[in-house]
Design a protein with these regions (language model features):
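Single conserved hydrophobic/aromatic residue that forms the stacking wall/gate
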Residues: 1-15
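Hydrophobic core segments of alpha-helical transmembrane domains in multi-pass membrane transport
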Residues: 10, 27-37, 109-120, 131-141, ...
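Long hydrophobic alpha-helical segments that form multi-pass transmembrane helix bundles
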Residues: 36-94, 269-277
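Transmembrane alpha-helical segments and their short flanking loops
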Residues: 47-60, 162-169, 212-356
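Membrane-embedded hairpin module used as a gating/binding unit in multi-pass transport
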Residues: 66-169
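Short juxtamembrane and helix-loop transition motifs at transmembrane-helix boundaries
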Residues: 89-97, 170-181, 195-207
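Alpha-helical transmembrane segments and their immediate juxtamembrane interface regions
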Residues: 117-151, 207-247
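Accessory "access/gating" subregions that flank catalytic or transport cores
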Residues: 157-190, 194
Length: 356
């Protein structure tokens, strides 16, 4: 498990790796990029709600959140089949407090280091070194990300103010990386619970070839769960456990490409044998589609059919999700919150005219 080959660039390169020409790869990446931008606007009111700040300019086009449509399917099933579970939901901050150090990122890194050291038959000194290295890395992942977000937030606000002033009152959002939501305790509570679940799934899941390390704190998974469920921790954990196999399979599929690229670039620390990958790299669905499109580009009819069906299903699911998010945003607007007209059903000026 290696952190981290990222985003649309990775989708682009993987298509070419699996046979797509430059034009086909570019078209698919542009298509996914457009959906990401649409999604960033759809999520903006939910971000405002989660941050309890309806004037903040921040949103994100991060590929993490393209899992939202899949998560929303399960969220709607919860609404229909298990609505009573929400009565037993609990406060994520209190859960983190109860788990304490033994469920922290540092402790999880120690567990993983010891486990990997034992199964690789290393001596006590090597196991101890590995445990503390893994613990330190896991602890630093989120801290360094939060530093970056804090550093660019004033710049983002300044850019937004400047652009809004020059565009005659048109409001623009500023896209940041996902950690501007990292202050929500639900992200870390769900990640702490999902970590041992992911390790267990990795050991028993058919077709999986990854043992999670850096990705064990499921930062490619929990932010989207937070947005769709709006912090319902039981839903986040259950849906997260259901969708984790997608990430493990996608990481296994990506391993030859990532290892080939790392060796071609003469990256340090790449083993002569075996493969490296990431267990929770964002965009698993997009990875599968990229591989199908890449293989379809070679002209095989069956792969062309599979790629076409996958793209149709992917697009249909996204626009169903868009409809559901617009319903959510309309409720925010009906409650008096400021919501852009293009992400809800009833435009503000139209509602005002009908009231007159």
């Amino acid at each position: 498990d290696v952190e981290r080959s990222r985003g649309l660039g990775d989708v682009y390169k993987r298509q070419i790796y699996f046979g797509a020409n430059l034009f086909v790869a570019t078209v698919l990446v542009i298509f996914i990029g457009v959906l990401k931008i649409i999604n960033s606007d759809l999520m903006k009111p939910t971000f405002n709600d989660l941050l309890d700040d309806w004037e903040n300019p921040m949103t994100t086009t991060h590929l993490n959140y393209m899992m939202n449509p899949v998560i929303m399917v399960f969220d709607k099933l919860f609404d229909k089949l298990f609505p009573w579970l929400d009565k037993y939901d609990f406060d994520a901050a209190k859960l983190n407090e109860k788990i304490g150090f033994w469920g922290s990122r540092f402790a999880i890194g120690i567990y993983l280091g010891i486990f990997i050291g034992l199964i690789s038959h290393q001596d006590i000194k090597s196991i101890t070194t590995l445990a503390f290295m893994a613990a330190t890395c896991l602890e630093l992942f989120s801290i360094i990300g939060s530093w970056f977000i804090a550093a660019v937030e004033p710049l983002s606000q300044g850019v937004a103010d400047f652009a809004n002033k020059r565009l005659g009152g048109r409001m623009l959002n500023i896209g940041l990386d996902w950690p501007f939501l990292a202050g929500r305790a639900e992200i870390w509570a769900a990640a702490n619970v999902l970590a041992p679940i992911m390790l267990l799934e990795a050991l028993v899941l058919p077709g999986n070839g990854i043992l999670p390390l850096g990705g064990i704190i499921a930062m490619g998974v929990t932010p989207a769960l937070l947005v769709v469920t709006r912090g319902k921790i039981i839903r986040m954990i259950v849906i997260g456990a259901i969708e984790l196999p997608l990430f493990l399979w996608a990481g296994t599929l990506s391993a030859p490409f990532i290892t080939h690229t790392a060796r071609a670039l003469h990256a340090s620390g790449i083993p002569a044998t075996g493969l490296i990958s990431s267990s929770t790299k964002e965009g698993p669905i997009e990875q599968f589609i990229a591989v199908l499109v890449g293989k379809a580009s070679k002209g095989e009819m069956m792969m062309i059919l599979y790629a076409a069906l996958a793209l149709i299903a992917y697009t249909a699911l996204f626009f169903w999700y868009r409809h559901e998010m617009m319903k959510r945003n309309q409720k925010y607007s009906d409650e008096g919150k400021e919501v852009a007209d293009d992400v809800k059903f009833v435009a503000t000026h139209a509602a005002a005219n009908s009231a007159d």
